[in-house]
Amino acid sequence: TASSPTLAAAQKLFDQIKVENCPGRTKKVAIFGLASDSTAKATTDALDTLRETHDDWYFLIPAGATDTIITALSTWASATVLTLAQLESGMVESEKLLIAQTKTKSLITTAMKANKQTVICYNHDADNTSIPAAWVGRVAPNYPTSVTWKWKELFGIPVTDEKGTDREDLLEGRYNMYIERHGREYMSEGICTDGDFIDTVIGRWQIKQTMRKRLVNELVDTENIGYDDDGFAAIAGVVIAALDDAVDNGIIMKQNGKGCYNVVIPKRADATDEQARNRVIPPIEWEATVRGGVHGVKVTGTLTVALVTANE
């Protein structure tokens, strides 16, 4: 209907093209509807079912969700970041980033601060505003180039009416708000409930996805990668190429024309008997310095790959 939160959110998402320095319009959006009286469990169960057939999305923007449902969605989104044990068991990772809004100043609890992949926006008129949709509509068209989520002017969003210490308390509590200072309106910190910045979270995901895609392409397009020093170096080249992509996209810092990252390439002699028997490369360790915005953060990772031996 014309007054539905879903329609209002969609309109705010696409309206950001009206902001002078918006880089473009969001090109693809999907709307997933549930009954207005759905419980928190029914909502997360429905998302699990959706992912079985449609898992090629990243931002989760609930329209008209209650605080109870937002809390459940936070736990659900946090669980989309898999542990090493889950990955080694064969589970496929597809992270989701929850960006929700509330008018409740006590929504971000200690428990929610332990959750990953959660961004909470506060506005006194949250029932009639769509900050998450507007914010995504303003920033997402920049990608794959990384940008800070702070300082973004939004179209059609009222500034918070919180002032002084009340506003500072909310900011310190990891709420994001549309604020006004020195005659300019803009979004505040761009921070997740666990203290990570949004651009850092998305940048890590971009690196992981690029690395995985490049790895699959390398394995499919190469007739045989030997279980030897040359084979290990070829796989390490995938890591380096993915990190170079991240440098080009402004995710990883560049100094003196080079990306600020380090990759440790294992040798065949480093492999244990069990790793060799199972054709699994010893972990390729890498470390990179995230560029971030004017607000260094280091990210690390491990790539483990199973190869076919050279003589098979």
State each model region's role.
Residues T1-E312:
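Surface-exposed assembly/interface segments
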